[in-house]
């Protein structure tokens, strides 16, 4: 019998490349890339608990490690992370540990956000040049998302975080650590400088994200879904989840075909104007 030792470093490098190239950059108002050495503040619970995958059988994959964004951005990335913001989160997390759920299909879709106040965020904006806001979600087998806060919709805590950080920071980047699209109406409300779906990239996920943030790799991911303004805007919305039959109300106009043909104004992605593609300049 021949024994073969896998060169795990090569697999890790390929995974890192796939993560970086798969990032979907929806908006970039000359915020990214950010050169190493920049002063940055990290907001959001998910920065400390990167979702490497969804739940269910696909989530029960053993990995050797999963590093979180502060470790990678402040370590390999060379960014100067705001110590006061990190310390505030560390103290809060000590009293609000990660909630894992109690069994199969019981893992929460999200983790509650640390409350923020104007004085704290305003002071952080005076110390740091750029804010990274990390919003995380998980879902999976027997645990599909629903049209509720903390799932498809943002929670009140996430809305407050976005409102304050985008108000006081001249440069703000929202990183969506998710496995599926979210409601995106908040982009128009808070106008962050950059928005990116970083997805769930396994154990090398945060390293791949770093390669996009610092300009080593140009994000070339494409959305697998059309993002409507509201769930009710999808043509199949009124016929979803029937117990006795499947009724394909959209006929041949599935996905983008419906919006492109009949309702471009109901679309949040570049069929409309919420994410102007002229601002997606990226130099590596």
Where are these regions (language model features)?
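C-terminal non-catalytic regions of proteins with extracellular/luminal or membrane-system context
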Residues: 1-284
């Amino acid at each position: 019998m021949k024994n073969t030792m896998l060169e795990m470093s090569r697999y890790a490098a390929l995974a890192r490349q796939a993560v970086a190239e798969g990032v979907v950059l929806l908006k970039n108002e000359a915020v990214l890339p950010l050169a190493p050495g920049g002063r940055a503040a990290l907001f959001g619970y998910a920065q400390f608990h990167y979702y490497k995958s969804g739940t269910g059988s696909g989530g029960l994959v053993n990995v050797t490690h999963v590093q979180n964004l502060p470790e990678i951005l402040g370590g390999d990335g060379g960014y100067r992370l705001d110590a006061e913001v990190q310390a505030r989160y560390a103290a809060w997390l000590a009293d609000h540990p990660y909630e894992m759920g109690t069994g199969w299909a019981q893992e929460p879709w999200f983790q509650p956000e640390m409350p923020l106040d104007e004085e704290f965020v305003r002071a952080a904006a005076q110390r740091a040049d750029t804010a990274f806001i990390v919003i995380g979600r998980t879902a999976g087998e027997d645990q599909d998302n629903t049209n509720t806060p903390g799932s498809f919709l943002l929670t009140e805590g996430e809305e407050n975080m976005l409102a304050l950080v985008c108000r006081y920071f001249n440069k703000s980047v929202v990183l969506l650590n998710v496995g599926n699209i979210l409601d995106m109406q908040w982009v128009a409300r808070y106008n962050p400088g950059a928005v990116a779906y970083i997805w769930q990239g396994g154990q090398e996920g945060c390293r791949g994200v770093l390669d996009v943030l610092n300009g080593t790799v140009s994000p070339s991911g494409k959305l697998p879904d059309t993002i409507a303004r509201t769930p009710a805007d999808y043509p199949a919305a009124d016929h979803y989840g029937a117990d006795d039959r499947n009724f394909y109300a959209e006929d041949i106009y599935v996905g983008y075909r419906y919006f492109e043909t009949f309702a471009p104004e109901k679309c949040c992605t570049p069929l409309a104007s919420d994410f102007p593609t002229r601002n997606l300049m990226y130099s590596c």
